[in-house]
Amino acid sequence: MKKHPKIRLLVMDVDGTLTDGCIYIGEEGEMMKAFHVQDGYGIVHILPELGISPAIITGRSSKIVEKRAGELKIHHLYQGVGDKLSKLRKLAEELGLNPENIAYIGDDANDLECIRWCGFSGCPADAVPEVLEAVHYVCRREGGRGAVREFISRLQCNP
């Protein structure tokens, strides 16, 4: 399987990227989020074939995200992160990676520093304008609707 020659880590935002950004609240106050199965397939089946590890860095904390990350075998999960770039730099250092070894996908202003720092970046089609202008690749799909899977496909063939 052909792959991007340098990328070894894919870092993903959650709300608005792996999900549609909506938070559903039931009558009893329970929160729910929707994740797309195509994104999950790409993370579990395609990334390992490419030799790329998945990671999540998100500003919110949620048991739902913890559960989904476990299902997808994402071992690098960081929730409630205020300074995403500092966390990303620390992770890169721990893994012995440079910015050019890291791909990042996110949708909002709090992702911009990471987007600018990484070697390859992308966003869902419905990202905020500043992000749409800053990334290397804008997905045709929206957040929570297969954008991450599309970005993973791009990692397969991007020189």
Report each predicted region and the residues it spans.
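Alpha-helical substrate-recognition element adjacent to the catalytic core
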Residues: 1-83
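Mg2+-dependent phosphoryl-transfer enzymes with acidic/Ser/Thr/Gly-rich catalytic loops
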Residues: 29-33, 71, 76, 85-159
